[in-house]
Amino acid sequence: MTDTALRAEALGKRFGRRRGGWALRECGFRLPTGRVCALVGPNGAGKSTLLALAAGLLPPTEGRLTVLGTSPAEARPRVGFVAQDKPLYPQLTVAETLLMGAGLNPGRWEADVAERIVAGGDLDPKARVRTLSGGQRTRVALALALGKRPELLLMDEPMADLDPLARHELMGTLMAEAAQYGTTIVMSSHVVAELEDSCDHLLLVGGGRIRLAGEIDDLRAAHRRVSGAAGTAGLDGHTVVESRTTGRQLTALIRPAGPLTGDWRASVPSLEELVLAHLRNPQAPALTTAPAVAEESAA
């Protein structure tokens, strides 16, 4: 067994030979097992590339990525992947799609799990995939992924085509399955609000590099949102991620190096405040609170 779901060391992926063709560069992080991880970043940040590498669909250009203690290719039977475009066979019915999932995952398939997820959306098992809405296709894709009882579930923008009610219901199903079976989940999104209430770990990607990595509570605790009168002294020696002055008021997100001096009002930032401040300032130093390299416990 391993206590690490994903571990990247100097990981990079380049497409083509152009100078600016790097989708990911010098990425290092560790994701422990049993976490629900938000993979966040703007469009084009490298989120989909990182998930494709973890799913074994792309080889890295440089560095190393281990999945569940082994290579992505060897870990593939233990990994579920829901791609952004939900690639399903349009000519198959819902029932035939689940039968295909059973045939592709001998010894691992949990038919009752897959059927329960499909039934939760009131889908007709005889309906052909090509007749389904985007949200219904998402539910079928999730049924396929969870039906194989994965140890690691990777999802690329899984809720993008769902209405708010369907998103809430499907997220509840997903969290219940994760809690019951201890599945590690990585969900990508560029909308932090979708993930804030469900995730306990964060990977923030910007410009193809890891900007923040670690437990969300630890990352929030390492920062302070401070406000005070413009011109107030006392931030020297602290890492200022972002500062803004509006009229006579200065607001900043900092990483304190010790006690604050001066007349500052300080609070722990929300996840959204933390993420947005780092994305608005690409020059802010990266922070990883979980060790990039950890001892693996062999079975």
Show which residues each predicted segment covers:
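Conserved structural motif at the start of ABC-family nucleotide-binding domains
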Residues: 6, 24-26
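The feature captures the beta-strand-to-loop junction immediately N-terminal to the Walker
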Residues: 40-42
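Helix-to-loop junction immediately C-terminal to a conserved catalytic motif
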Residues: 55
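Catalytic Walker B motif of ABC-type/P-loop ATPase nucleotide-binding domains
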Residues: 153-157, 162
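ABC transporter nucleotide-binding domain
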Residues: 168-254
